[in-house]
Amino acid sequence: MEEKQILCVGLVVLDIINVVDKYPEEDTDRRCLSQRWQRGGNASNSCTVLSLLGARCAFMGSLAPGHVADFLVADFRQRGVDVSQVTWQSQGDTPCSCCIVNNSNGSRTIILYDTNLPDVSAKDFEKVDLTRFKWIHIEGRNASEQVKMLQRIEEHNAKQPLPQKVRVSVEIEKPREELFQLFSYGEVVFVSKDVAKHLGFQPAVEALRGLYSRVKKGATLVCAWAEEGADALGPDGQLLHSDAFPPPRVVDTLGAGDTFNASVIFSLSKGNSMQEALRFGCQVAGKKCGLQGFDGIV
C-alpha cells in the first residue's frame, strides 16, 4: 500500500530574492550579488523541506492562473510536491514578494504584495479526501474558515481507529487576534517568537508556560526562538529544549522557521519523540541558514 502523504495548507508566493553584501541605504543605487526567483510562502516552503527530507507531501493553497502560477506549479512538481489539492481562483492575482537577503549576516527583509487572492475556504477543504493523508499541517491565515477545516478533521478522526487517524499541526506565526482561536486545535501547535512577544512573553519557556492553557488536552506547544534554539511543552508538563545549531556563517534565514516546522513534523511522523524532533528541527534549520535557498539541507 502506498504511504500516506503529509498535506500542508497555506500560502504560496513568488519570492524575488536579491542577495546583497550589505543592507542598502534609502535612495541609492546598488548592485546585488545575485538575484533569483524562488517559490515561497510558509506552507509552500515546508513542502519543499518535507520533500527534500524524503516525505511524500502535498500542498493546498490558492493560485490564480498566469505566468507566476505556472512558475510556482512547475517548481512544486520539480520538487516532487503533489499539487492536485491546489485551489484555482478565478479572481485575484498570485501574491509576490520582494526579499532582500543580507549576505553579511543572513537577515531577510520581505516586502509582500499580498494580493486580493481569496484563501482556501472550508468549502474547498470539503473536497479533500482525508484518508490520503497521515498528517495535515495548517498555516494560520483565514482562521474562522480554518477552524471549520480542523473540525472536519476531528469529526473524521472520531470515526477512525488510532492508526488511521490524521495527525494535525497548526502554525500561529502572525500576531493577529483572529489567529489565536487556532491554539485550541491540533496535537502540535507551533507559536512564533513574534506572537509570544506580542502577547507579553519572553523567552520561549515563559511563552510556553503562559500559553499552554490555550491548547487542547494532550497537545504539545512548540516555540522556536532563533539562535536560542527551540522549546516544547507537552501534556506531561515537562519542558523540552534543544539548542540551536548555527552554521559556520549565517547567509540566508529566509524560510528557516518553515524548515524547522517541516523537520519537526517529519521527525514526529516517523515515530520519533518530541525531544528528538525538536533537536532535528534545530539541526536542519541551522543548516539551512548557512545556505542560499533549500538545496543542500540534507
Curated annotation (Swiss-Prot):
Pathway: Carbohydrate metabolism; fructose metabolism. Requires potassium. Inhibition by ADP. Its EC number is 2.7.1.3. Catalyzes the phosphorylation of the ketose sugar fructose to fructose-1-phosphate. GO terms for biological process: fructose catabolic process; fructose catabolic process to hydroxyacetone phosphate and glyceraldehyde-3-phosphate; fructose metabolic process; glycolytic process through fructose-1-phosphate; regulation of glycogen metabolic process. Belongs to the carbohydrate kinase PfkB family. One of its GO terms (molecular function) is ketohexokinase activity. InterPro entries: Ketohexokinase-related, KHK, PfkB_dom, Ribokinase-like. It catalyses: beta-D-fructose + ATP = beta-D-fructose 1-phosphate + ADP + H(+). It comes from Mus musculus. ATP binds at R108, A226, E227, E228, G229, G255, A256, G257, D258. This is Ketohexokinase. Homodimer. PANTHER family: KETOHEXOKINASE (PTHR42774:SF3), PHOSPHOTRANSFERASE SYSTEM TRANSPORT PROTEIN (PTHR42774). It is an enzyme of class 2 (transferase). It comes from the Eukaryota. Pfam families: PfkB. The keyword Nucleotide-binding applies.
